[in-house]
Each structure stands twice: as structure tokens, then as C-alpha cells.
């Protein structure tokens, strides 16, 4: 939902385009509004996620429509996620009781050093049942197995009949690395994490300097 206002500003409903959201867990065709692909976390694993995180000094979140669902609506990192994606926050008394709908992604937020231990704990508990990775030092993504931005981009590429060499991808977060490595042209923002810059083909200007527009002008329109 964070990119929906941008998609509307670009008039993608008229001109066509796709939104790959939730780290690739969902693909939406902007011209029709139809979800053409979605993979959700098996419901039987939700109890395990909740059980592993509930008693920790961390905030567990998921998404329902344009709302963030959490037991900790006042948490600073919940507020940050709300601000980044322009989503409202709904506080609930019991996360597991409330979340009976299909879940594309869960997010765990905490201070970076502490979250590293949480990441190790969850990976040890779930093994290969889920994709668990950091998008920011303070955000830990919990996704369905084999879901990341690269796998979603490949799914869309095959549907559109494109070659990898025809794809450019811009990113700044740790969860963008797979996508940047997959694309024929991988572009990191100037404000990107250093790990992202190390794997890219080109570093563009920062988000604040309209770096995506700069890259489009240089490599596509230019």
C-alpha cells in the first residue's frame, strides 16, 4: 500500500504497470486492480510465529488491507512502518486471535542488536519452512517459503516474456539485494545500505534527490 499513491500519480491504471508488494508475496496488475499472484504464510505456522515473538521485547505486525495489525500500536518501530507505508495502525488485544485471514507477510521490529538474536531464534525454529530476512537493521521480514523480490520479479518477467537483460531494478534496503542481483541492471540509491551498493551495477542519486528518475533518464530515456 505504500506505493499505491505513487502508482496513482504515475497513472498506471491508465498506462499499465504492476505492483510487487510485500517483498514479492503479491503481484497486482495496476490496469485492472487484479491480484495476479499471491502466496501466503501457512496458517498452521502463525501460532509458532506468535509463540516465538510474543514474550520478546519486539513488535510483531502484519497487514489487513491498508492497516497494520499489532499488539503494540505505540511502539516506535510500528510508527516508523506506518509512516513509511502511509498505513493506519490497528491495535489488537491478542494478535493470534485476531489474525484469522490469509497473511502474506509478518514483520518483527526491534533494535538492531536485539533483532539479530530474534532472527537467529526464528530461523532455528522454522528452518526452511519460511523465508526470514532483514530488510533494515530494525525490521525482520517473515515471508512464505521461497518468496523474495527476485523470485517475484522472475515470475512477472516470465509472464511478460522479457529477458533479464531488459530489466532494471532500483533499491536501498537489504531486502532489495536479491532483486538488484537478478535484474540485468541493478541500481542502488545513494542512501542505500552498504551491502546493497556492493552488489549493484550503478549507484544513482538518493531518494531525496529523485534518484529513480535520474536513473530512468540516464539508462532508459537517455
Residue spans for each PLM region:
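Class I S-adenosyl-L-methionine
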Residues: 4, 8-11, 54, 119-124, ...
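Mg2+-dependent phosphoryl-transfer enzymes with acidic/Ser/Thr/Gly-rich catalytic loops
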Residues: 141-222
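Active-site phosphate-binding/coordination module
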Residues: 1-77
Amino acid at each position: 500500500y505504500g506505493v499505491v499513491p505513487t502508482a496513482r500519480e504515475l497513472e498506471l491504471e491508465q498506462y499499465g504497470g504492476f505492483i510487487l508488494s510485500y517483498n514479492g508475496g503479491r503481484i497486482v496488475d495496476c490496469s485492472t486492480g487484479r491480484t495476479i499472484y499471491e502466496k501466503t504464510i501457512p496458517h498452521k505456522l502463525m501460532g509458532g510465529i506468535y509463540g516465538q515473538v510474543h514474550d520478546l521485547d519486539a513488535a510483531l505486525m502484519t497487514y489487513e488491507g491498508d492497516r497494520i495489525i499489532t499488539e503494540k500500536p505505540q511502539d516506535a518501530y510500528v510508527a516508523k512502518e506506518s509512516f513509511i507505508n502511509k498505513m493506519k495502525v490497528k491495535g489488537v488485544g491478542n494478535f493470534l486471535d485476531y489474525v484469522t485471514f490469509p497473511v502474506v507477510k509478518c514483520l518483527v521490529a526491534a533494535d538492531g542488536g536485539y533483532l539479530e538474536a530474534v532472527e537467529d531464534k526464528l530461523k532455528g525454529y522454522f528452518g526452511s519452512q519460511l523465508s526470514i530476512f532483514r530488510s533494515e537493521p530494525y525490521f525482520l521480514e517473515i515471508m512464505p517459503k521461497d518468496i523474495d523480490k527476485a523470485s517475484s520479479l522472475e515470475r512477472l518477467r516470465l509472464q511478460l516474456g522479457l529477458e533479464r537483460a531488459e530489466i532494471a531494478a532500483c533499491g536501498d534496503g537489504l531486502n532489495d539485494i536479491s532483486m538488484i542481483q537478478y535484474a540485468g541492471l541493478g541500481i542502488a540509491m545513494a542512501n542505500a545500505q552498504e551491502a546493497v551498493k556492493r552488489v549493484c551495477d550503478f549507484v544513482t542519486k538518493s531518494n531525496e534527490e529523485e534518484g529513480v528518475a535520474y536513473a530512468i533518464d540516464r539508462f532508459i530515456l537517455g
